[in-house]
């Protein structure tokens, strides 16, 4: 049991990058994929979705960068995790989707942040 407790402590001390690397190594060693259970859950959620009438996933669309394009690029980078060039390309290619399949609350937060930066945004 002491070995298991030490293992738990060691795993808890890992950084996110180290945990991701560990996951890859275990997948290779055991010949499995960590993505399989997620796909099953997504299929189950997709099957239940037609029963619900209310939309649960929203897309945030940047329709115009406005006058303060630099501020909008900064916020797009923060929201999406894109690099500077990719965020700039996305902003300049408006109308363009910033984030897809997010909850209503998250979509509204993203819309508010982008509008405060000077952009025009649509939530679909």
Curated annotation (Swiss-Prot):
It holds the Pfam family Ribosomal_L12. One of its GO terms (biological process) is translation. GO terms for cellular component: cytosolic large ribosomal subunit. It comes from the Bacteria. Keywords: Ribonucleoprotein, Ribosomal protein. The keyword Ribonucleoprotein applies. GO terms for molecular function: mRNA binding; structural constituent of ribosome. Gene3D superfamilies: 3.30.1390.10, Single helix bin. Forms part of the ribosomal stalk which helps the ribosome interact with GTP-bound translation factors. Is thus essential for accurate translation. Homodimer. Part of the ribosomal stalk of the 50S ribosomal subunit. Forms a multimeric L10(L12)X complex, where L10 forms an elongated spine to which 2 to 4 L12 dimers bind in a sequential fashion. Binds GTP-bound translation factors. Belongs to the bacterial ribosomal protein bL12 family. This is Large ribosomal subunit protein bL12. It comes from Paramagnetospirillum magneticum (strain ATCC 700264 / AMB-1).
């Amino acid at each position: 049991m002491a070995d298991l407790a030490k293992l738990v402590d060691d795993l808890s001390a890992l950084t996110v990058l180290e945990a991701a690397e560990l996951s890859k190594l275990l997948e290779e060693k055991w010949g499995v994929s960590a993505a399989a259970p997620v796909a099953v859950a997504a299929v189950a959620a997709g099957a239940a979705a037609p029963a619900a009438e209310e939309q649960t996933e929203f897309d945030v669309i940047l329709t115009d960068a406005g006058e303060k394009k630099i501020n909008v690029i900064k916020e797009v980078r923060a929201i999406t995790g894109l690099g500077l060039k990719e965020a700039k390309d996305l902003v300049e290619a408006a109308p363009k989707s910033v984030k897809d399949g997010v909850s209503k609350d998250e979509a509204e937060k993203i819309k508010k942040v982008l509008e405060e930066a000077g952009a025009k945004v649509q939530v679909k």
